[in-house]
């Protein structure tokens, strides 16, 4: 039976359409109500091993799927008006050689003036990839069991996640100086107590630098083909504060739909906007799915 977070459907409905884009608010904002904070399952480490193993499986499985991505990133002016927008709609499919590529369906000229966003930024979900907590990386994190929470029809275990690098000043400084720094997830995850897999995450990418900031995002997942919990909706509404004194109010909404198992390799190339008749011309290489690491414009 297909299992789905009702919150995903509600949020997507509320945020569809141009008018709604001006009035939408973050779903489930603030601190959630968590029960059984003092108690804990008998095998917390076993639960962590189980859901991080599932993360590894999901990452590999997603490499065999095509899907549609609709990304809207907006800057918000004082008073709540939209001051700029980046809107990119794409379909990720496979060519005859098994390479997945991004076919741009809609990409009007961005109107942002405060920050710049590249195609590569769009692949970086708030600074981290969708499956940041896979088995090979759990040694990089500390997990703290918080309690149990019911989300719609699902009972979940709740964990706070902290990258160990934040406590290592020398390594942290080196990462910030790197031209291609590794990103980590810091935040909270909700794990389905039946399937032991992440169904929701809230957090951000770290470390940040003086010129590169990440919004706090919330990601919901949906069960695809009866077994894979893939991200289907990501939302952020946050202020990015740069050392220069500039503050940017950023709103982001990304939807993943129309998953179809096609098989292939996860080497992704990019194709042009259909509206510009460039469908048959592969462009520069690009990473796999997922949103932004905004940088202030000079």
Predicted ranges, named:
Residues 1-4:
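Positively charged n-region of N-terminal signal peptides that target proteins for export
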Residues 7-16:
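Bacterial N-terminal signal peptides
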Residues 17-21:
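Sec/Tat signal peptide C-region and signal peptidase I cleavage site
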Residues 22-185, 193-200, 204-215, 223-233, ...:
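Structured extracytoplasmic
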